[in-house]
């Protein structure tokens, strides 16, 4: 049969990335408490394409994923990237896994358990044999406005916010490390199941620790700077303001070197 993909391109221009998007697959990820967690991932996968080829071989991306049945970590992701690069005879390979990750959290007063969902992304790229990985996680928190608390006779406005962390690491780290780091940076964590005693605890604890988005992003960034496995990070905090018709945000991005490591 004629291989149209390998025929000459009408416009001889190289393509940076071509492949398939939004392919859903079951996924196994490392879980600090349980060892392993089964979830569902939405996958984007692609390669570069030289100027002289009309098209890529889309079926080979799916074949590579079908043959990849490993637990998601850096080593297994590198093997997947190498397989894709070989199958497509490419110089560069790319894969992105988007998946929900669940942690069963106990309410602070009653201990009632409830699952909290965190949206995660792991991106891998391979070029000239060198892999690079980017881990991202979104963590909901609660914030209480310090200004509102200071100027009001009673109460203060509070709202949910999200801490978005992206890191490049030199070795494996648990997702829970970054989730914990984000949650302690806000006024309070948020929970799925709260009884009245828990609501009282969360409200009083949050009002005892009021935070601007600036406070939250600085606290998270300071903790990320101290992480021994991080070479680069970006953290953004977005607050869904309860008394404004807009959101507030703050972000910090840093490259970590031995010279910039705290205590060096």
From Swiss-Prot:
Chain positions of site May be catalytically important: 145
Family named by the database record: Belongs to the GTP cyclohydrolase IV family.
Keyword terms: Hydrolase
Pathway the protein contributes to: Cofactor biosynthesis; 7,8-dihydroneopterin triphosphate biosynthesis; 7,8-dihydroneopterin triphosphate from GTP: step 1/1
Natural source organism: Nitratidesulfovibrio vulgaris (strain DP4) (Desulfovibrio vulgaris)
Recorded catalytic activity of this chain's protein: GTP + H2O = 7,8-dihydroneopterin 3'-triphosphate + formate + H(+)
Coiled coil: none
Full protein name: GTP cyclohydrolase FolE2
GO molecular function, one term: GTP cyclohydrolase I activity
InterPro entries: GTP_cyclohydrolase_FolE2 (IPR022838), GTP_cyclohydrolase_FolE2/MptA (IPR003801)
EC number of this enzyme: 3.5.4.16
HAMAP family: GTP_cyclohydrol_B
């Amino acid at each position: 049969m004629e291989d149209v993909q390998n025929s000459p391109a009408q416009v001889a221009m190289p393509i940076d990335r071509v492949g398939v998007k939004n392919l859903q697959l079951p996924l196994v990820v490392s879980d600090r408490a349980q060892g392993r967690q089964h979830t569902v991932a939405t996958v984007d996968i692609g390669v570069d394409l030289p100027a002289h080829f009309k098209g890529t071989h889309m079926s080979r991306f799916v074949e590579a994923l079908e043959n990849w049945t490993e637990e998601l970590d850096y080593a297994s992701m590198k093997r997947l990237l190498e397989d894709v690069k070989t199958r497509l005879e490419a110089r560069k390979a790319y894969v992105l896994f988007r998946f929900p990750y669940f942690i069963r959290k106990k309410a602070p007063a009653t201990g009632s358990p409830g699952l909290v969902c965190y949206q995660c992304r792991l991106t891998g790229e391979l070029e000239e044999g060198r892999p690079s990985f980017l881990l991202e996680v979104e963590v909901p928190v609660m914030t209480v406005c310090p200004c509102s608390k200071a100027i009001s006779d009673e109460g203060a406005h509070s709202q949910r916010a999200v801490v978005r962390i992206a890191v490049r690491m030199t070795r494996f780290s648990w997702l829970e490390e970054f989730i914990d780091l984000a949650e302690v940076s806000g006024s309070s964590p948020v929970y799925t199941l709260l009884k009245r005693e828990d609501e009282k605890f969360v409200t009083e604890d949050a009002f005892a620790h009021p935070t601007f988005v600036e406070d939250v992003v600085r606290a998270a960034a300071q903790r990320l700077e101290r992480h021994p496995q991080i070479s680069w990070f970006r953290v953004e905090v977005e607050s869904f303001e309860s008394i404004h018709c807009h959101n507030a945000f703050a972000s910090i991005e840093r490259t970590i070197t031995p010279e910039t490591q705290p205590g060096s």
